[in-house]
Amino acid sequence: MINIEWRKDTLVLLDQTKLPTEIIYVHCTDWRQVAEAIKMLRVRGAPAIGVAASYGLILAAMEAGRLEAPFSEQLTSLYEFSETLKETRPTAINLAWAVDRVISLVKDQVESMSSMSEVVDLITKEAIIIHEEDVSLNRRMAEAGATLFEGQKNIRILTHCNAGALATGGLGTALGVVRKLHENGQLERVYADETRPLLQGARLTAFELHEDSIPVTLETDNMAAYAMQHGLIDAVIVGADRITTKGDVANKIGTYGVAVLAKFHNIPFYVAAPYSTFDFTLENGSDIPIEMRDDYEVTSLHGIQTAPNGIDVLNPAFDVTPHELVTAIITEEGVLKPNYEESIDKLRQIVESK
């Protein structure tokens, strides 16, 4: 199922807020529609919103080119539009990474250009490259992650939120590894946390695994401890929205709790994420900005009120798992293990040398 597709002058997105009961596509012809789709979670997952934002910049450049203004002022407008796109989801670093990558390319080559049509062409090519790269690195991550399970059979994986094909441009990060294990005949079953309050595990992870005929059992978030206590889980694999140089991991709210449970039950806790998820400007997870979302996501479910009027609500979209709880980080360049400051720095050197 295609979740992101660029068609001439239009970004087509699978509306993930409608899953699993409806398959509806949103057609974005304006960069503000892309920004809204990201903010409202019609497209979500750190890699996916990075890809979507890069395509959104094509539409932003088109709009800037329609302004009756000198080329330099059109460029200024494009840069302003790009900042608005970056602000839609503050925690997922892939979004800023993709936007900054595209805009940096424009600034590097702007001296050789004289019109916004040239800028549009440049951004279009780069956005397509970013999308294609995501597809490729998902496969490489899947292969790297599978090496952690060599010689094992009947593996039971617990995952939290959705780090699958719906969250990326390819196979998925955490679920990419799951798919590889299934392909190898090693996977027995996936246990998917429903992931309150927006149920990404129930609506998205269970949906895409079921569609692909991969055995999956849905559980509420507060059943993870039971599953571990009763020997139903062999490993945990999750995705990530931002990883610091220490190896602290920001991911969907509830991930930290799963990591604590895994540590207590001596179950390996793996994080699967591409290089673009690493934030080399931050050392500590406590410095990661955490997006706070609207109260109604907690006080209602599918439009039905489930809490008293006027109740105070705490609704962070993410939490941070300390690096001490992370067994290994799966990347497209291989598996990173503690000491993370050293292994992450080595990852950076490898990528920057290419």
What is the meaning of each model-derived region?
Residues I2-M113:
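Long amphipathic alpha-helical segments
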Residues L14, A52, A96-A98, L158-N162, ...:
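Short beta-strand segments
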Residues V26-R42, T76, T147-G151, I155-T159, ...:
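Short, hydrophobic/aliphatic alpha-helical segments
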Residues H27, W31-V34, A46, G50, ...:
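Generic structural signal for well-ordered, non-membrane alpha-helical segments
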Residues M40-G56, R89, N94-L95, N162-G170, ...:
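Conserved phosphate/anionic-ligand binding catalytic regions in large, soluble enzymes, centered on
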Residues N94-R156, Q186-E188, A192-V236:
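Ligand-binding beta-strand-loop-alpha-helix segment within the catalytic cores
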Residues G172-E183, A259:
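Histidine-anchored nucleotide/phosphate-binding helix
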Residues L187, E194-K354:
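Conserved phosphate- and dinucleotide-binding cores of soluble alpha/beta proteins
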